[in-house]
């Protein structure tokens, strides 16, 4: 089985099959999730200093911050051409 990767902005990629959720960072529960991940050293900031527009929750407990809108990431995830393949 080939691994598939998803571009989450500025050349950063994550493993597509390990994504649990792609959500907006605006709600209080998501802000708490991000803060808890930061406290447990499980936060990956892929924004390059830009505004966080999406929070990606991974199956291993890591939380990834992305500067790309959640809808755009979901569209890339559903569009097979936007996934890079390794293997």
UniProtKB/Swiss-Prot annotation:
Signal peptide: none annotated. Belongs to the RemA family. This is Putative regulatory protein BA_4010/GBAA_4010/BAS3723. Pfam families: RemA-like. InterPro entries: RemA-like. It comes from Bacillus anthracis.
